[in-house]
Amino acid sequence: MGLTETTLVLVSLAFFASAVAHNCQNGTRPASEEKREGCDYYCWNAETNSWDKFFFGNGERCFYNDGGEGLCQNGECHLTTDSSVPNDSDV
């Protein structure tokens, strides 16, 4: 394989990897993560052969498996529904 063919293959692979990664970035909820509890999610990184951790954007709807619902803020799910957990005003 000559230099031109090798370059073409590498450029094609880089384009494919960037197209796949485009669906998995901070603030963008991939369809595969619609049922994920909390505000973080993982996407496979083919270049490093490992999982990259991302976070939903601020204001994105989130939930807990116990039925609690909230909004993401700085990577954490802040409940907006009563979860029957004591808070400061309950003491």
From Swiss-Prot:
Organism name: Ixodes scapularis (Black-legged tick)
One GO cellular component term noted in the UniProt record for this chain: extracellular region
Name of the protein in question: Salivary lectin pathway inhibitor
InterPro entries, per the entry: Ixonnexin-like
Free-text function comment from the UniProt entry: Inhibits the lectin pathway of complement system activation in the host by reducing binding of mannose-binding lectin and L-ficolin to their ligands. Does not affect the classical and alternative pathways of complement system activation in the host.
Tissue-level expression: Nymph salivary gland (at protein level). Saliva (at protein level). Not detected in midgut.
Main localization of the protein described in the UniProt heading: secreted
Subcellular location(s) per record: Secreted
Cytoplasm as UniProt keyword: no
